[in-house]
Protein backbone atom coordinates (compact mmCIF):
# COMPACT_ATOMS: atom_id res chain seq x y z
CA UNK A 1 0.00 0.00 0.00
CA UNK A 2 1.04 3.65 -0.28
CA UNK A 3 1.96 3.92 3.39
CA UNK A 4 4.21 0.88 3.19
CA UNK A 5 5.86 2.23 0.03
CA UNK A 6 6.86 5.42 1.86
CA UNK A 7 8.02 3.57 4.98
CA UNK A 8 11.73 3.21 5.55
CA UNK A 9 12.81 -0.39 5.01
CA UNK A 10 16.58 0.00 5.38
CA UNK A 11 18.69 2.49 7.27
CA UNK A 12 22.43 2.55 6.69
CA UNK A 13 24.32 3.46 9.83
CA UNK A 14 24.42 6.51 12.06
CA UNK A 15 26.35 9.66 11.06
CA UNK A 16 26.12 8.49 7.45
CA UNK A 17 22.43 7.70 7.50
CA UNK A 18 20.99 6.51 4.22
CA UNK A 19 17.26 5.89 4.20
CA UNK A 20 15.61 3.61 1.66
CA UNK A 21 11.85 3.26 1.39
CA UNK A 22 10.04 0.07 0.47
CA UNK A 23 9.14 1.63 -2.88
CA UNK A 24 12.73 2.63 -3.63
CA UNK A 25 13.95 -0.83 -2.67
CA UNK A 26 11.40 -2.48 -4.94
CA UNK A 27 12.45 -0.28 -7.86
CA UNK A 28 16.16 -0.95 -7.30
CA UNK A 29 15.55 -4.69 -7.00
CA UNK A 30 13.43 -4.81 -10.16
CA UNK A 31 16.09 -2.93 -12.14
CA UNK A 32 18.94 -5.19 -11.00
CA UNK A 33 16.76 -8.23 -11.66
CA UNK A 34 16.22 -6.87 -15.15
CA UNK A 35 19.98 -6.54 -15.62
CA UNK A 36 20.52 -10.11 -14.42
CA UNK A 37 17.76 -11.37 -16.68
CA UNK A 38 19.36 -9.56 -19.59
CA UNK A 39 22.60 -11.43 -18.88
CA UNK A 40 20.79 -14.77 -18.95
CA UNK A 41 20.03 -15.43 -15.28
CA UNK A 42 16.87 -17.48 -14.86
CA UNK A 43 14.98 -19.53 -12.28
CA UNK A 44 17.18 -22.10 -10.57
CA UNK A 45 20.52 -20.48 -11.47
CA UNK A 46 22.97 -19.95 -8.63
CA UNK A 47 24.41 -16.48 -8.06
CA UNK A 48 27.15 -15.78 -5.53
CA UNK A 49 27.03 -12.43 -3.72
CA UNK A 50 30.36 -11.20 -2.33
CA UNK A 51 29.62 -7.80 -0.88
CA UNK A 52 30.08 -5.69 2.26
CA UNK A 53 27.26 -4.58 4.55
CA UNK A 54 25.72 -2.05 2.19
CA UNK A 55 22.13 -1.76 0.92
CA UNK A 56 23.23 -3.02 -2.49
CA UNK A 57 23.92 -6.42 -0.93
CA UNK A 58 20.25 -6.62 0.06
CA UNK A 59 19.22 -5.46 -3.41
CA UNK A 60 21.34 -8.23 -4.94
CA UNK A 61 19.74 -10.88 -2.73
CA UNK A 62 16.22 -9.76 -3.51
CA UNK A 63 16.95 -9.37 -7.24
CA UNK A 64 17.94 -13.03 -7.36
CA UNK A 65 14.81 -14.01 -5.44
CA UNK A 66 12.68 -11.93 -7.83
CA UNK A 67 13.88 -14.09 -10.74
CA UNK A 68 13.65 -17.38 -8.86
CA UNK A 69 17.45 -17.59 -8.93
CA UNK A 70 19.21 -18.99 -5.86
CA UNK A 71 21.60 -16.60 -4.13
CA UNK A 72 24.57 -17.70 -2.09
CA UNK A 73 26.05 -14.90 -0.02
CA UNK A 74 29.71 -15.28 0.92
CA UNK A 75 30.97 -13.20 3.83
CA UNK A 76 32.65 -10.10 2.41
CA UNK A 77 36.44 -10.26 2.50
CA UNK A 78 36.55 -14.05 2.89
CA UNK A 79 39.79 -15.58 1.63
CA UNK A 80 40.03 -16.39 -2.07
CA UNK A 81 40.43 -20.10 -1.39
CA UNK A 82 37.18 -20.17 0.59
CA UNK A 83 35.32 -18.24 -2.09
CA UNK A 84 36.67 -20.64 -4.74
CA UNK A 85 35.32 -23.65 -2.83
CA UNK A 86 31.84 -22.13 -2.85
CA UNK A 87 32.04 -21.19 -6.53
CA UNK A 88 32.81 -24.81 -7.38
CA UNK A 89 30.28 -26.35 -5.03
CA UNK A 90 27.25 -24.38 -6.22
CA UNK A 91 28.39 -23.96 -9.85
CA UNK A 92 27.68 -20.24 -9.71
CA UNK A 93 26.53 -18.81 -13.02
CA UNK A 94 27.32 -15.26 -11.92
CA UNK A 95 28.97 -13.35 -9.09
CA UNK A 96 27.87 -9.97 -7.75
CA UNK A 97 30.62 -8.23 -5.79
CA UNK A 98 31.54 -4.93 -4.21
CA UNK A 99 34.81 -3.23 -5.09
CA UNK A 100 35.75 -2.98 -1.42
CA UNK A 101 34.58 -3.14 2.18
CA UNK A 102 35.20 -0.77 5.09
CA UNK A 103 36.65 -2.00 8.37
CA UNK A 104 37.89 -0.04 11.39
CA UNK A 105 40.81 2.02 10.12
CA UNK A 106 41.19 0.32 6.74
CA UNK A 107 39.69 -0.37 3.35
CA UNK A 108 39.53 -4.02 2.27
CA UNK A 109 39.83 -4.51 -1.53
CA UNK A 110 37.43 -7.26 -2.63
CA UNK A 111 38.16 -7.41 -6.36
CA UNK A 112 41.69 -8.92 -6.10
CA UNK A 113 40.26 -11.62 -3.82
CA UNK A 114 37.46 -12.28 -6.31
CA UNK A 115 39.88 -12.49 -9.25
CA UNK A 116 42.11 -14.95 -7.42
CA UNK A 117 39.13 -17.06 -6.35
CA UNK A 118 37.92 -17.37 -9.93
CA UNK A 119 41.42 -18.37 -11.05
CA UNK A 120 41.52 -21.06 -8.33
CA UNK A 121 38.04 -22.42 -9.03
CA UNK A 122 37.54 -25.18 -11.57
CA UNK A 123 34.09 -23.82 -12.42
CA UNK A 124 34.10 -20.38 -14.04
CA UNK A 125 31.11 -18.04 -13.74
CA UNK A 126 29.70 -16.58 -16.94
CA UNK A 127 30.09 -13.01 -15.69
CA UNK A 128 30.60 -10.76 -12.67
CA UNK A 129 28.80 -7.56 -11.70
CA UNK A 130 30.88 -5.15 -9.61
CA UNK A 131 29.42 -2.35 -7.51
CA UNK A 132 32.05 0.40 -7.59
CA UNK A 133 32.40 2.27 -4.30
CA UNK A 134 33.83 5.77 -3.96
CA UNK A 135 36.40 4.62 -1.39
CA UNK A 136 38.13 2.26 -3.86
CA UNK A 137 37.23 1.53 -7.45
CA UNK A 138 38.20 -1.80 -8.98
CA UNK A 139 39.73 -2.65 -12.33
CA UNK A 140 37.28 -4.63 -14.46
CA UNK A 141 38.21 -7.49 -16.78
CA UNK A 142 36.75 -6.81 -20.21
CA UNK A 143 34.18 -9.35 -21.31
CA UNK A 144 33.75 -10.87 -17.85
CA UNK A 145 33.19 -7.98 -15.44
CA UNK A 146 30.41 -5.41 -15.72
CA UNK A 147 29.78 -2.21 -13.80
CA UNK A 148 26.63 -2.40 -11.65
CA UNK A 149 25.45 1.13 -12.45
CA UNK A 150 26.05 0.74 -16.18
CA UNK A 151 23.98 -2.44 -16.36
CA UNK A 152 21.17 -1.14 -14.17
CA UNK A 153 20.88 2.16 -16.05
CA UNK A 154 20.18 0.29 -19.28
CA UNK A 155 17.93 -2.42 -17.83
CA UNK A 156 14.16 -2.67 -17.76
CA UNK A 157 12.42 -3.60 -14.51
CA UNK A 158 11.84 -7.35 -14.28
CA UNK A 159 8.58 -8.83 -13.04
CA UNK A 160 8.49 -11.43 -10.26
CA UNK A 161 8.91 -15.01 -11.42
CA UNK A 162 6.39 -17.35 -9.71
CA UNK A 163 7.97 -20.08 -7.58
CA UNK A 164 6.65 -22.92 -5.46
CA UNK A 165 6.81 -22.77 -1.69
CA UNK A 166 9.35 -25.61 -1.59
CA UNK A 167 11.66 -24.06 -4.21
CA UNK A 168 15.08 -22.98 -2.88
CA UNK A 169 15.47 -19.36 -1.80
CA UNK A 170 19.18 -19.47 -1.03
CA UNK A 171 22.23 -21.59 -0.28
CA UNK A 172 24.27 -20.52 2.74
CA UNK A 173 27.49 -22.34 3.55
CA UNK A 174 28.72 -23.35 6.98
CA UNK A 175 32.04 -21.84 8.06
CA UNK A 176 34.06 -24.96 7.28
CA UNK A 177 35.95 -24.91 10.58
CA UNK A 178 35.17 -28.60 11.17
CA UNK A 179 35.63 -29.77 7.57
CA UNK A 180 34.38 -29.04 4.08
CA UNK A 181 31.81 -26.19 4.06
CA UNK A 182 28.29 -27.52 3.71
CA UNK A 183 25.65 -25.70 1.71
CA UNK A 184 22.40 -25.30 3.66
CA UNK A 185 19.34 -24.77 1.45
CA UNK A 186 16.31 -22.85 2.70
CA UNK A 187 12.96 -23.04 0.85
CA UNK A 188 10.96 -19.94 -0.01
CA UNK A 189 7.59 -20.60 1.63
CA UNK A 190 8.19 -22.20 4.99
CA UNK A 191 11.24 -20.07 5.71
CA UNK A 192 9.43 -16.76 5.22
CA UNK A 193 6.39 -17.92 7.19
CA UNK A 194 8.56 -18.96 10.13
CA UNK A 195 10.55 -15.72 10.08
CA UNK A 196 7.39 -13.63 10.07
CA UNK A 197 6.11 -15.67 13.03
CA UNK A 198 9.31 -15.13 15.04
CA UNK A 199 9.22 -11.36 14.58
CA UNK A 200 5.82 -11.22 16.24
CA UNK A 201 6.18 -13.98 18.80
CA UNK A 202 9.88 -13.90 19.72
CA UNK A 203 10.68 -10.20 19.40
CA UNK A 204 7.26 -8.51 19.63
CA UNK A 205 8.15 -6.45 16.55
CA UNK A 206 5.33 -5.09 14.42
CA UNK A 207 4.97 -3.18 11.12
CA UNK A 208 6.48 0.30 11.20
CA UNK A 209 8.88 -0.40 14.08
CA UNK A 210 12.69 -0.43 13.83
CA UNK A 211 14.75 -3.60 14.21
CA UNK A 212 18.53 -4.00 14.31
CA UNK A 213 20.28 -7.34 14.05
CA UNK A 214 23.94 -6.43 14.58
CA UNK A 215 25.19 -9.24 12.38
CA UNK A 216 26.32 -9.58 8.75
CA UNK A 217 24.38 -10.65 5.68
CA UNK A 218 27.09 -13.27 5.13
CA UNK A 219 25.79 -15.26 8.11
CA UNK A 220 22.43 -16.86 8.79
CA UNK A 221 21.38 -14.23 11.34
CA UNK A 222 21.95 -11.55 8.72
CA UNK A 223 19.97 -13.43 6.09
CA UNK A 224 17.13 -13.99 8.50
CA UNK A 225 16.98 -10.86 10.64
CA UNK A 226 18.63 -8.11 8.61
CA UNK A 227 16.90 -8.95 5.35
CA UNK A 228 13.99 -11.35 5.13
CA UNK A 229 12.29 -11.21 8.54
CA UNK A 230 12.13 -7.40 8.82
CA UNK A 231 10.95 -7.00 5.23
CA UNK A 232 8.30 -9.72 5.31
CA UNK A 233 6.97 -8.31 8.59
CA UNK A 234 6.88 -4.70 7.37
CA UNK A 235 9.47 -3.30 9.78
CA UNK A 236 12.49 -1.05 9.26
CA UNK A 237 15.85 -2.84 9.30
CA UNK A 238 19.14 -1.20 10.30
CA UNK A 239 22.15 -2.10 8.17
CA UNK A 240 25.55 -1.29 9.71
CA UNK A 241 28.91 -1.57 7.97
CA UNK A 242 31.96 -2.00 10.16
CA UNK A 243 32.14 -3.24 13.73
CA UNK A 244 29.47 -1.72 16.00
CA UNK A 245 31.83 -2.21 18.97
CA UNK A 246 34.80 -0.63 17.22
CA UNK A 247 33.91 1.78 14.40
CA UNK A 248 35.36 4.03 15.65
CA UNK A 249 34.92 2.93 19.28
CA UNK A 250 32.79 0.72 21.52
CA UNK A 251 30.28 3.51 22.06
CA UNK A 252 29.13 3.20 18.47
CA UNK A 253 26.75 0.40 19.38
CA UNK A 254 24.81 2.62 21.76
CA UNK A 255 24.96 5.67 19.49
CA UNK A 256 23.25 3.69 16.74
CA UNK A 257 20.59 2.51 19.18
CA UNK A 258 19.99 6.05 20.45
CA UNK A 259 19.95 7.50 16.97
CA UNK A 260 17.93 4.99 14.99
CA UNK A 261 15.95 2.84 17.38
CA UNK A 262 14.75 5.45 19.84
CA UNK A 263 14.79 8.70 17.87
CA UNK A 264 12.01 10.25 15.83
CA UNK A 265 12.13 9.63 12.11
CA UNK A 266 12.28 13.41 11.73
CA UNK A 267 15.66 13.59 13.49
CA UNK A 268 17.92 13.99 10.46
CA UNK A 269 20.94 15.14 12.43
CA UNK A 270 21.79 11.66 13.80
Residues covered by each model-derived region:
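Conserved pre-ATP/AMP-binding loop-to-beta segment of ANL
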Residues: 128-131, 142-173, 180, 190, ...
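Conserved AMP-binding/adenylate-forming core of the ANL superfamily
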Residues: 11-62, 79, 83-84, 140-150, ...
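Single conserved hydrophobic/aromatic residue that forms the stacking wall/gate
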Residues: 1-6, 10, 262, 266-270
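Conserved AMP-binding/adenylation subdomain of ANL enzymes
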Residues: 192-210, 220-261
Amino acid sequence: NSRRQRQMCIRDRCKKVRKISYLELKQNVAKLAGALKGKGIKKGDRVIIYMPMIPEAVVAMLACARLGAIHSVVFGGFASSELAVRIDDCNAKAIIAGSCGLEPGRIVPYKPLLDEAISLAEHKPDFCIVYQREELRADLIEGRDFDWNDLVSEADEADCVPVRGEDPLYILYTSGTTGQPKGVIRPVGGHLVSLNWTMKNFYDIHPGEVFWAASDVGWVVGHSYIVYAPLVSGTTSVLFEGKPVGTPDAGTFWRVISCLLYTSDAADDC
